[in-house]
């Protein structure tokens, strides 16, 4: 028997690799259905009528394909929101209607929350939110989504509906807008930050120059977005090792600096000491923000003015900022002084000021570790 030619071998390798991945995707989604309360929602919707359907969509499908941890589950259905409510009532599943005007009902089972969104088509947009009509067309719903990698649906058996080849883009490392990129951005300017997040997480290629031009042309539209949504997206971008990836991509970094000019210390992360590098993934978002914005000026106060965070987090950030503005030397970190600081401010505050000193030092003194 003749050995396959090189081009044929490459084709066969890719074919069997994709086939194996499809088996994994199917098995993983079946596992999620069987081992989480999602199975009750699938049963409630699928049994509502002969034509009712429900599928996994968006981030949970994307994460399964990339073999990432699935931390939340979004669902799409061809039922209207009122029909979804009726279907859930029939199975005694609790829900609330907070997002009903946008087509989303949130089901609650065993303290788990599942967003169930009706298929939609956009009627009008204002750069923040869209006015929608409900639809029965799965492809029409997919066409209004932002990126091909987020327009992949899957039923409870793991069968994919992928009208824009999002799975292929995801596996090959392409971040492609659906349709006209500028139109997609102008529908919701938060998509600029979402593009950066997905690019940093999944792309294997340089930015398309045309996409960067479009983003820069429309970047002022970010001012239309609420501070809560901006902070939420920044948190996702900087989670895990996203910030370290950002520092290696100059175009992404420049865009982040335009959108968040308060992050004045961001380039300092290029020269972290060895201890800081080793422990970087252990720090939480608010402490990360302290490292990014506290610089001895009113910058931290300005950040808190621009962006809404909880009062508890505000207090924590202000405490680190106040401490930094004092004339702090290594002698400040004596056991006596730290005990006094602990007495007035608590354990977390002591940890924060020590870590803040460590992360802002070129080398780390043993007495701080």
Language-model segments: residues:
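Catalytic cores of the polymerase beta-like nucleotidyltransferase superfamily
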Residues: 3-369
